[in-house]
UniProtKB/Swiss-Prot annotation:
NADP(+) binds at G166, R167, S168, S191, I232. Its EC number is 1.5.1.5, 3.5.4.9. Homodimer. One of its GO terms (molecular function) is methylenetetrahydrofolate dehydrogenase (NADP+) activity. Keywords: Amino-acid biosynthesis, Histidine biosynthesis, Hydrolase, Methionine biosynthesis, Multifunctional enzyme, NADP, One-carbon metabolism, Oxidoreductase, Purine biosynthesis. The gene is folD. PANTHER family: C-1-TETRAHYDROFOLATE SYNTHASE, CYTOPLASMIC, C-1-TETRAHYDROFOLATE SYNTHASE, CYTOPLASMIC-RELATED. It holds the Pfam family THF_DHG_CYH_C. GO terms for biological process: L-histidine biosynthetic process; methionine biosynthetic process; purine nucleotide biosynthetic process; tetrahydrofolate interconversion. It comes from Cereibacter sphaeroides (strain ATCC 17029 / ATH 2.4.9). This is Bifunctional protein FolD. Transmembrane segments: none annotated. Belongs to the tetrahydrofolate dehydrogenase/cyclohydrolase family. Catalyzes the oxidation of 5,10-methylenetetrahydrofolate to 5,10-methenyltetrahydrofolate and then the hydrolysis of 5,10-methenyltetrahydrofolate to 10-formyltetrahydrofolate.
Amino acid sequence: MTAKRIDGKAFAAGVRARVAEEVARLKEGHGIVPGLAVVLVGEDPASQVYVGAKGKQTVEVGMASFEHRLPAETSEAELLALIDRLNHDPAVHGILVQLPLPAHLNADLVINALDPAKDVDGFHISNVGRLGTGQKSMVPCTPLGCLMMLRDHLGTLSGLNAVVVGRSNIVGKPMAQLLLGESCTVTIAHSRTRDLAAVCRGADILVAAVGRPEMITGDFVKPGATVIDVGINRIERDGKTKLVGDVDYASAAEVAGAITPVPGGVGPMTIACLLANTLTACCRANGLPEPQGLTA
């Protein structure tokens, strides 16, 4: 058996098209333009690429894009003052502070200074708590993208066994909460889990978000399972740098029913869900119905 390849790039394009339709409807029906502000401190090369991609896609779906690029030596007080201005700016519906921040800045303090209603990354402690207690929240983008693909592929997730390998605040924990919200039976596995392969083999849904290249092999996969690979790792192979996931695609694809590739799987969904979250935040701020299917 060879697994179905879940094309995240194509799925993300569909999400962006849906967001663009809803943005056009907001403009025509209500004169409202959703706005996303992205804050970058310093000159980290990867962060600069991400911020550029976010700004480009924001404009492509018809939203207003506000980029704030600050020098690496920006003080905490200066950054917090900018966030306060953005919190009170009615043209800004979503705010994203690009991580990682320079070492002298307290990331938790900065993130928790955001207006939770504008926290489109879903990292504010209020949104974390709301997600954990089943209340309406802003949902972290990568887990939301995974959930969208799972819903599309499987339909109902109720009653399925799900194993999330990884317990980070950014992916593992919120992914487990989202799956629990779909009435899955959820196990969170990690570096201290005993007999990890056996735990994973019990999963109808296996989400790998552990940050170790090709750690999850076909031996970890239940026949017919759906495998979502969140990992993005750069490795040297045959004298070349290659991007691989946390799953060994070749062996896992021989066992799984469906699997996301790396690259081209979960990655493209992250920015698409950032745009979806900005749209959701805009609708909530204006007391308008949220578009269906674009949030948890």
